[in-house]
């Protein structure tokens, strides 16, 4: 999700943003449409999402290998470990493209892990700050995060694909809304 506050906006050149206002709005419309498509067609968008993530993993693996050999030092172990990570990226990316169903399940497991970690962190935060006013919200959000992680992990394959596609669709729609509000800050003056 895009997070843009006043401090970020002040760092941008105002004239440059006014020139690119239409492009920002166009990207926002595309994000909104893709978000709606992800929610409307979860299985097709799940396959596409897995393929895109696989392609990005392959590009990352290639970039890591190129970076290793162009910037290598005389230390053997960092180069070897970086090469092994690059090979892992390439293999995982290949499997994401070759078997999109497995890729989307891996994405679902990763998202479940993120929710679980976030839930544990929120619960720890609540426990440390339980005497403070309003700390109960940390408890509620932490429990909800763990419940969402459990739903992701315990879901059937069809539900898992639907959950991931819906989550990505909602995220894209919120990013589109954020870009629309960002673009509306820079109205062209006649």
Swiss-Prot record:
GO biological process, one term: response to pH
Cellular component, GO annotation: plasma membrane
Residues in the Cytoplasmic compartment per record: 1-25, 71-76, 127-138, 188-190
Membrane topology of this protein: Multi-pass membrane protein
Compartments, as annotated in UniProt: Cell inner membrane
Keywords associated with the record: Cell inner membrane, Cell membrane, Membrane, Transmembrane, Transmembrane helix
InterPro entries: Acid_resist_chaperone_HdeD (IPR052712), DUF308_memb (IPR005325)
Periplasmic side: 45-47, 100-103, 162-164
Transmembrane regions: 26-44, 48-70, 77-99, 104-126, 139-161, 165-187
Protein name, per record: Protein HdeD
Protein's organism: Escherichia coli (strain K12)
Lineage: Bacteria, Pseudomonadati, Pseudomonadota, Gammaproteobacteria, Enterobacterales
Gene this protein is translated from: hdeD
